[in-house]
Amino acid sequence: MAELLAPAGNTEALDAAIGEGADAVYLGLKSFNARLRSSNFAWNQFESAVQAVHKLGKKIYVTVNTVVEENETERLYRFLSYLDKIGPDAILVQDFGVVRMVQEFFPRLVMHASTQMNASSAAAVNLLSKEGIKRVVLARELQGEEIRSIRHNTASELEVFVHGALCVSESGLCLFSSYLGGKSANRGMCTQACRRYYETESGAGAKEKGYYFSPNDLQLIDRIPFLAETGVDSFKIEGRMKSAEYVGSVTAAYRYVLDHWREDKEGTVAAGKRMLATDFARAKTHFLFDGADSSKFLNPDQAGGTGIYLGKIDAVRTEKAAERSAKAELSGAADAGSDNAGVSATGLSGSALAGTGSGSGAVQKFALLKGGSYDPESGDSIRIHKKDDSGRVSYKVQSVKKFANAKDRQESWISVPADASRGDSVYLLQTKSMTKRYKRVLASDLSQFRLQPGGERLPVLDLTPLQKETLSFFPEGTYIQVSTVSDLYAVAPEHPVRFIIELNTETRRSLIDKKEALPCGKKQVFISLDPFCPPKTQTVLENDIEALSALGFTQWVVNNPAHIALLKNKNVRIIGGSYLYTFNRWAVSWLENQNIDAFTMSYETSLKNLEAIFEGTQRSRMMICLFSYPALFRMRFTLPESYDFSWFADKEGMMFRALSTPDGSFVMPEQPFSIIDRMQHLRKIGFSRFLIDMSKTAVRRADIKVLMRALYKGEALPDTSRFNWKDGFYSAVPLRAAAPGKAPKAAGKT
């Protein structure tokens, strides 16, 4: 019987998920999980939850699905040791370092590969299975037939998202939020750049605004029969940041369909859809399940938040609690002050924002809504979006009052937060009537649950010592990466020590079909593989590898576990690409065990972290990117034809470029990442391989000359970004100091 897996972002959602029939729940604790903005579980709550859920014959999974920096590995070790003692049914992992640490020290912990690991083909799933990962959460971007193909080619357990919010970017590959301030999606700190309001300018010069990258919500309830017949092991509902009411209603609908579709497929699905009508989330989509028509899941006119649209605030007025007098504020001038007030996006309680002052002199603000089809009632939950997109706040309506308008007709005014203003949009999240009480899962007395992570020391891990011939294929010097053969010719006069060229539709045609001449020998070329590798790509790639190898191309840059599997036991040399994340020494060690000895830095990393991972001669294994226009969004579809713009800007005026190609769509920043002026310092501290990444960029000789001149003179380039190079990831969790004492040694390469 397939498993129904529901989210538990807090204890109330846990109660709802179990109460509505989920077979398993997944939850996070206060760190190392990809939803740090949800409430998550305290240590005693988690221990109680594991005990209680197991008594009910159900399962509980813990998210450990973020990348981990080197200075966090000891805290990770203590956390895994704690989980090993508590005994959840599995942990969800993204970082290869977590996999390596579990393999070494905690073999009892069952591992599931998070969707953030970007496993999207049978090759990737089978490689991870051999590494001890029992289940893989497949990438959301897969089509139905691709899921069926993977099922037919692996014995591993497969988990599929069937309902909830979507990321516009391919799983685990979004850099946008991190670029904007270090709040990385790979660290559970995503600020949802895809949900933001952007201004565009078309080729004709017309300016428009919209939510251009905010996808609708996934709903595959009518595809449950197909997925069940395919043999999917677990049906996953997204929503660790959603309310208990949402979790309960969605879980109930999918429970019903899973239990009854064999009796009456059509009628059961129809009933399930009716049950989902109250989830009050965004408009629904099958996303890419049936094909890649982006116009069906991107709607620039739809606000990035969830809920049923209730209209805009047409007028506001205030009323003192003790006096029944009301003062209308119908002019734009009256709202000028509150328009500039900051609105929290973290969902503050209504009582904290409802009025000013206290007691009999307290002031309550009321709003008149226009443009919707439903009048909220007292007790309903709403979300208010500021008209300038400066923030959003969730609020429970405290009261509804009737006031006469100019024509002496009674109109309903609802209480709103103090900084709500004319022009703000209002959405219904749930009605008071939806509120449902569930039986408590956790023990009423949590004092008996006292386990917490201890003070264990993480054994020291030494990377494999370098032999003289280990890096013979990876010489010191400057590497230049491009996207086309013509770009190879543009950069060739700069005489890089090696060239890297992306394998894409155009280069496949140039290298394999046309066998075009190159400005260099094939031994000077690395072929870089795209980080997203679904079944269709895997099939093509297997043929490409054979064809290119026969032509003399034997050096590769790999960016997905599938690439490792496809190149295994072939006479090739491999560099780990920037999307095979190596944020800690344990991840490097895991990749060493896959016979990868050279690496490319992730665009999100910092100098401090690289210095901590690689010491002494080990630094010669890491290629440092000095310049790039990093892909902030990587999307598995072409943008809608109506998107007739190349550039767009956010409300701060930062500019970004949108690019659609036969291989997908990309968003790049106007300001490139650059640390070109730091090369000489990096050489002094032992790093000696450097990358100039010009991929997905129109390469011009003049630009290359400027870059190389700055490189050799050690000059900083204007109008560029350091990304996270100096400050690293934003962190809301302070690190605890390590206990004194000497740590033991860990095993090296296995």
Q: Predicted regions span which residues?
A:
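Active-site pocket-lining/capping segments in soluble small-molecule metabolic enzymes
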Residues: 1-119, 137-141, 146-236, 241-332, ...
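Conserved nucleotide-cofactor-binding alpha/beta core module
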Residues: 122-123
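Long, basic N-terminal domains or extensions that often function
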Residues: 132-134
